[in-house]
Amino acid sequence: MRQLRGKPKKETSKDKKERKQAMQEARQQITTVVLPTLAVVVLLIVVFVYVATRPNTTE
């Protein structure tokens, strides 16, 4: 059957599998890239605040 110009084509099972695979890879990247980066940023902020607010011990 001919596809009408304005309508999107129906998703095939192959397209669905590819989309699921892409979503799985995106989730994998979140755990391997985003979380460690976020942890480093939080750690840097904590260290900066600690250094900035510690009492001076110069005599």
Curated annotation (Swiss-Prot):
Signal peptide: none annotated. One of its GO terms (cellular component) is membrane. Keywords: Coiled coil, Membrane, Transmembrane, Transmembrane helix. It is found in: Membrane. The chain crosses the membrane at residues 32-52. Residues 1-25 are annotated as: Disordered. The keyword Transmembrane applies. It is a single-pass membrane protein. Residues 9-22 have a biased composition (Basic and acidic residues). Belongs to the SMCO4 family. This is Single-pass membrane and coiled-coil domain-containing protein 4. It comes from Taeniopygia guttata (Zebra finch). The lineage of its organism: Eukaryota, Metazoa, Chordata, Craniata, Vertebrata.
